[in-house]
């Protein structure tokens, strides 16, 4: 499980590339969809995947913070402010890339869970190999 310095490192690594970017599209891996369909709370907890998409697509990433071992994404549209909370778990990671081939570690490239397509033509990818 990542310690505080590693979580801060991830936060600092992604923030300059995603701050002020609009989330245009959210894509879930098949295993995330299958997990939800089988009543397992995987990756997106407490809501349906379609609801998550409706509450994030079209929103701008205003700020990224680290609180303890959590990465907090502050997002907003013209009407609402929202907060996304992420924990890296045992082996999770975020990557900002133009395409999945740019993720240099094969296991992370293969085991992506969620892709946020941004209006700056980059992708914020959450990957977890466990």
Regions found by a protein language model. Name each.
Residues 1-130:
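Acidic, proline/glycine-enriched N-terminal capping motif
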């Amino acid at each position: 499980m990542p310690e505080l310095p590693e979580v801060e490192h991830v936060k600092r690594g992604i923030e300059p590339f995603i701050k002020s970017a609009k989330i245009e599209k959210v894509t879930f891996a098949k295993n995330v969809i299958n997990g939800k369909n089988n009543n397992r709370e995987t990756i997106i907890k407490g809501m349906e995947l379609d609801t998550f998409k409706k509450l994030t697509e079209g929103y701008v990433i205003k700020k990224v913070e680290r609180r303890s071992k959590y990465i907090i994404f502050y997002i907003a549209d013209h009407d609402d402010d929202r907060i996304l909370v992420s924990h890296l778990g045992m082996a999770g990671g975020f990557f900002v890339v133009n395409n999945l081939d740019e993720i240099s570690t094969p296991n992370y490239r293969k085991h992506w869970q969620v892709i946020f397509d941004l209006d700056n033509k980059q992708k914020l990818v959450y990957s977890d190999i466990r």
